[in-house]
Amino acid sequence: MNVKGTPTRTIWPAREGGAVWIIDQTRLPHEFVTQRLNDLGAVAHAIRAMLVRGAPLIGATAAYGVALGMAEDPSDEGLTRACQTLLATRPTAVNLRWAIEAMAESLAAVPPDQRAQAAWAKAGAICDEDVALNEAIGDHGLGIIKDLARTKGVEKGGEGPINILTHCNAGWLATVDWARPWRR
């Protein structure tokens, strides 16, 4: 998504590393405010207080939370503690659990002195995967919408409108980034 002409994700790593930035969704729609999350506790608060919303974004945020936790304590106990802390923020959130389990599984065999770097890379990969999945969903959905428009004759002033119902939080703010086809 572009914010004032700048491509922006809903979560992104700080340039100097060691932190992530999020859009504080509690301030929308009246203000566009970003917040820097420097540690595991800040990430847990952001999830619990719903500064980030939407299943995919919550999962991505949790992945970066594990990475920040590994910067604090990369031991096996630190990994367990980071995962448990984040799981407690939204116990029923499916993507949160999935991301935490993916991080834990990926990091379990990594030596502790390499975990922070590996965790950061894995969290970034989870975010990139979310963008790719959303792009695939968008490509598929765009085809369906075009077919419906042709069927209804919308392009020639025929029946309309085409109604689209979303479930839960949908769109760019609920994900890391959204698919390109919706911007066409």
From Swiss-Prot:
Protein family membership: Belongs to the eIF-2B alpha/beta/delta subunits family.
Disulfide bond entries: none
Taxonomic source organism: Rhodospirillum rubrum
Stretches that traverse the bilayer: none
Entry-linked Gene3D superfamilies: translation initiation factor eif-2b, domain 1 (1.20.120.420)
BP GO terms, sorted: L-methionine salvage from methylthioadenosine
Alphabetized InterPro entries for the sequence: IF-2B-related, M1Pi_N, NagB/RpiA_transferase-like
Domain of life: Bacteria
Listed GO MF terms: S-methyl-5-thioribose-1-phosphate isomerase activity
Protein name: Uncharacterized protein in petC 3'region
